[in-house]
């Protein structure tokens, strides 16, 4: 039976879950994840304890609990559960209070209270921009892009563009490199004025073939030899044109996005 891990938060739980994934990925073990967001009352805290204790009894072992509860009373209630409770708020905030000689606000969900802020507006604009400029469907306003991702079809351009927009407010367009471009030996014409904004994504040809076969099984588009040809030509073109690029094969979207931000010297706040 897989160990049970609870993600307990008074907000969405995104912060706690991100931290939990980072820690748990260090262990060669699968886990059963249980998300318990919006614990913003004493009653909900007691209800959470019941869920945790029930899991302990069912599993025959203590669950692991990652918590970012700000309210002290709710936090103490959860800590009384039959579990290993890892309190990220107390672990980091209290030493900072001592070091800075300041009291934190202890405001629940403060990191996500951005619905009326300029940052929120920036993020929405970036998402709309990325959707409008997905897969080269529009050449309008490409000059407004923070970055333009290029690569062969199914190399990870679309999810990376949307992640950059949603997480960092980056206006990320993406443009496909197709066989006609390789025959001409040149970048697509609409990209010529924006070479300084280009960043390429490549991928292992066999992995690309697997992905394409899910979409169009048995087609030339998905054939291993065609995928090898397209990847070789795309990488050669990017080297020739001086475009920075990376392979997305063994990287998460988070890793790809962080690398892109570093390479193109973009400084953005994570939302």
From Swiss-Prot:
Enzyme class: transferase
Pfam name, any one: Kinase-PPPase
Binding annotation for ADP: 151-158
Keywords on record: Kinase, Nucleotide-binding, Serine/threonine-protein kinase, Transferase
EC number(s) reported in the record: 2.7.11.33, 2.7.4.28
Superkingdom in the source lineage: Bacteria
Coiled-coil stretches: none
Reactions catalysed: [pyruvate, water dikinase] + ADP = [pyruvate, water dikinase]-phosphate + AMP + H(+); [pyruvate, water dikinase]-phosphate + phosphate + H(+) = [pyruvate, water dikinase] + diphosphate
Molecular function GO labels: ADP binding; ATP binding; phosphotransferase activity, phosphate group as acceptor; protein serine/threonine kinase activity
Biological role: Bifunctional serine/threonine kinase and phosphorylase involved in the regulation of the phosphoenolpyruvate synthase (PEPS) by catalyzing its phosphorylation/dephosphorylation.
Protein family (similarity comment): Belongs to the pyruvate, phosphate/water dikinase regulatory protein family. PSRP subfamily.
Protein name: Putative phosphoenolpyruvate synthase regulatory protein
The organism of origin for this protein: Burkholderia thailandensis (strain ATCC 700388 / DSM 13276 / CCUG 48851 / CIP 106301 / E264)
């Amino acid at each position: 039976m897989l160990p049970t891990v609870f993600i307990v938060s008074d907000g969405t739980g995104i912060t706690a879950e991100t931290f939990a994934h980072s820690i748990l990925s260090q262990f060669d073990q699968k886990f059963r994840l249980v998300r318990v967001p919006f614990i913003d009352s004493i009653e909900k805290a007691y209800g959470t304890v019941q869920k945790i204790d029930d899991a302990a009894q069912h599993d025959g072992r203590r669950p692991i609990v990652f918590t970012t509860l700000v309210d002290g009373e709710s936090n103490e209630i959860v800590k009384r559960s039959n579990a290993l409770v890892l309190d990220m708020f107390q672990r980091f905030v209290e030493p900072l209070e001592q070091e800075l000689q300041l009291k934190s606000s202890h405001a629940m969900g403060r990191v996500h209270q951005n619905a009326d802020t300029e940052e929120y507006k920036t993020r929405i604009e970036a998402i709309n921009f990325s959707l409008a400029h997905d897969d080269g469907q529009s050449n309008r306003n490409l000059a407004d892009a923070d970055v333009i991702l290029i690569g062969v079809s199914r190399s990870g351009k679309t999810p990376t563009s949307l992640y950059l927009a949603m997480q960092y407010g980056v206006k990320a367009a993406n443009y496909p490199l197709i066989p006609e471009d390789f025959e001409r030996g040149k970048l697509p014409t609409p990209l010529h004025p924006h070479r300084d904004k280009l960043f390429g994504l490549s991928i292992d040809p066999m992995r690309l073939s697997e992905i394409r076969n899910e979409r169009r099984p048995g087609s030339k588009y998905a054939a291993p030899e065609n995928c090898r040809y397209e990847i070789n030509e795309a990488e050669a073109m990017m080297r020739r044109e001086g475009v920075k690029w990376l392979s997305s094969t063994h990287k998460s979207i988070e890793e790809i996005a962080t690398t892109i931000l570093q390479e193109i010297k973009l400084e953005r706040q994570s939302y």
